[in-house]
Structures are given as C-alpha cells and as structure tokens.
C-alpha cells in the first residue's frame, strides 16, 4: 500500500475574497504538510495536492466541512512520495484561463455531462467529433483513440483554433474531454455560446474514466500527462499502448524533458540516450544558445566534439 496520495479536484463556486481565502488556505495546507498547486478565484477553486494518506484524508475532511466544497469530488491517485516540491495557493482572475472577452460561467452554461460508459459509446460513434481540450504536448503522450488534436500550446488558444476550424466542426456532435474535467466545464460552455448546439463533455475527465470499473480506461492510448513531478500516469487497464514518439528519432517514448535553453523550455519526448546526444536541446539554435543550461557545464572542446558528432558546429563568433 502506498504511503502518499495525490488529490486532483476543482469546484465552480463563489469565493467572495480570493486573496484572503488563499492566505488562510495556504496556512492550513502547510499545517497539514501538504505540497501542491491551488488556484482560487471568485469563480471557485482548482487544485492538485500531495501528502501522506493521513494528511490528504484530513484535507478532504477539512474541505467537506466548508459548505461551498461539501460535494466536491476528489480524484485520488496512490503515490510513493510527494508529487510537488512546494505548496502554493494563488489568487487568480480565473481558475482556468480561456481569456475570453466575455467570460463563461459553467454554473450557467456548460456541455451535457457524459459518464464514462456514455463517453465510451461516443468514442465508437463515427458521427461524433471527439475533441481533446488539452495542449498539444499533453495529447502527444496520450489521448483517446480517434480524438482530434488541436494545434495549441495553451488552453487560451483553443477558442481561436475552433474559429479557424469552424467549417469542419459545424453541425457536428461534439464531445470534449480533458484531464479532470475543469477545462471542459468552461470550454464546452463557450462552444455552446459560440453557436455549437450539440456539445457534451466527459464528466470527471480522463482521470475518472481511467478508474471507472466498467470502462477501465479502454480506448485510451498512451499515458495521461499531469502537471506535477510524475509527468504522466497510466490510464488504460485493458490493453495499454505507447503512442509517444521520440522527438529526435521517432521511436516509442514516454519520457518528457524540457529544452535546456531557458528561453525556449519546450517540452519534448526523448530517451536518455538522445537527451545526451542532442545536448537536451530541441534545435541547433537552442544547443548553441549562450544561456543553455546543459552546455554551460561542458568544456569548449567537449562541446565542439558533441556537436560534430551530430554534424553541427559552433557559430563563428563562439569559436
């Protein structure tokens, strides 16, 4: 049995004074020795925290004693250690940002909820568009079979992508999904206000689908990206597969790294061998960038040799 747990949760509910709430909530979390990242806004709370089983259970009881969060659903993962290094509770304008001119309130408008078994039926329906509401790098390590991959690197880019592809989506049945459900609450509501009539969402997100006793994560390929030190977690309990491809050679890979150029910081899938071979950098420009955090520890001679091994050279001004 694991000694730690990771809790993923959200709740759209009114928080009148997010700044004060954030300070008090941070103090409570630290007292329980939790670590994680929580966003609070007047529209609600969005968090992921880790801690011992005892501490996380205490936190869930603590939240249940607040009428605003009494019915909040927690997605619980077993863990061997903390999934975060620190504890942050931050007030924000939104708990998930679409940066719309006119914000959408999921308590007033949102897509129809599909439970996991209903969502699985939608996956098998050729007349339904399954739309991934996550970022491209999340999709690349794992996604539902047949899902559409929006070319976005940030959630707030999604409405623009929809507008650019409106013709292909017009008059279609749209079912959207995300990690835990929070992004789809707002995004599906926006779709309805944007003129799409038949809009549904996976209730509880991928995390709930993967733990459902009936679906057992079936029709999910790869792993689910998570925003903590675990990076990715398994979902499909029936017939798991690997869909991630190494950025450098296209071989199967589920290991994410960040480009060593801090001005890039792009997330790429790479094996340990290719990380070393390509100096943990996504391009030649990033490899030779003066701020590169990987190459700064190499002597000029070794740097030159490593570049020559991949048919690259230092820029003249550096030589």
Curated annotation (Swiss-Prot):
Reactions this protein catalyses: uridine(34) in tRNA + AH2 + O2 = 5-hydroxyuridine(34) in tRNA + A + H2O
- What is this protein's name? tRNA uridine(34) hydroxylase
The Rhodanese domain is annotated at: 124-218
Could you tell me one molecular function GO term of this UniProt entry? oxidoreductase activity, acting on paired donors, with incorporation or reduction of molecular oxygen
Task: Tell me which species this is from.
Answer: Listeria monocytogenes serotype 4a (strain HCC23)
Q: Name one GO biological process term.
A: tRNA modification
Sorted alphabetically, the keyword list is:
Oxidoreductase, tRNA processing
UniProt cross-references to CDD domains, sorted A to Z: RHOD_YceA (cd01518)
InterPro entries, from UniProt? Answer: Rhodanese-like_dom, Rhodanese-like_dom_sf, Rhodanese_C, TrhO, TRHO_N
Query: Active site at which residues?
Result: 178
Function comment: Catalyzes oxygen-dependent 5-hydroxyuridine (ho5U) modification at position 34 in tRNAs.
Which Pfam family name is an example for this entry? UPF0176_N
Q: Could you say which protein family the record assigns here?
A: Belongs to the TrhO family.
Q: What is its EC number?
A: 1.14.-.-
Query: Could you confirm whether the keyword Transmembrane appears in this record?
Result: no
């Amino acid at each position: 049995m694991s000694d730690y747990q990771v809790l993923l949760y959200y709740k759209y509910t009114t928080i009148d004074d997010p700044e004060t709430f954030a300070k008090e909530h941070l103090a409570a979390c630290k007292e329980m020795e939790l670590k994680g990242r929580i966003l609070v806004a007047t529209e609600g709370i969005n968090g992921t925290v880790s801690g011992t089983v005892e501490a996380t259970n205490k936190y869930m009881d603590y939240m249940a004693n607040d009428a605003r969060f009494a019915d909040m659903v927690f997605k619980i993962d077993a863990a061997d250690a903390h999934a975060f290094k620190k504890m942050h509770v931050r007030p924000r304008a939104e708990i998930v940002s679409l940066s719309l001119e006119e914000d959408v309130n999921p308590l007033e408008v949102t897509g129809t909820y599909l439970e996991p078994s209903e969502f699985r039926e939608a996956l098998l329906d050729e007349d339904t568009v399954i739309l991934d509401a996550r970022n491209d790098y999340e999709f690349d390590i794992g996604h539902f079979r047949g899902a559409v991959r929006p070319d976005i690197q940030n959630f707030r880019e999604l409405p623009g992508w929809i507008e650019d592809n409106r013709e292909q989506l017009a008059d279609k049945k749209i079912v959207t999904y995300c990690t835990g459900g929070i992004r789809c609450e707002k995004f599906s509501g926006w779709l309805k206000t944007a003129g799409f009539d038949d809009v549904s969402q996976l209730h509880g997100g991928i995390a709930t689908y993967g733990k459902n006793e009936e679906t057992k994560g079936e029709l999910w390929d790869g792993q689910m990206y998570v925003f903590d030190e675990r990076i990715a977690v398994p979902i499909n309990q029936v017939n798991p597969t690997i869909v991630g491809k190494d950025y450098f050679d296209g071989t199967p890979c589920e290991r994410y790294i960040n480009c060593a150029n801090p001005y890039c910081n792009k997330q790429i899938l790479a094996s340990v061998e290719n990380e070393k071979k390509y100096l943990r950098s996504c391009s030649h420009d990033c490899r030779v960038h003066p701020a590169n955090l990987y190459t700064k520890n190499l002597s000029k001679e070794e740097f030159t040799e490593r570049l020559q091994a991949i048919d690259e050279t230092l820029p003249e001004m550096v030589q």
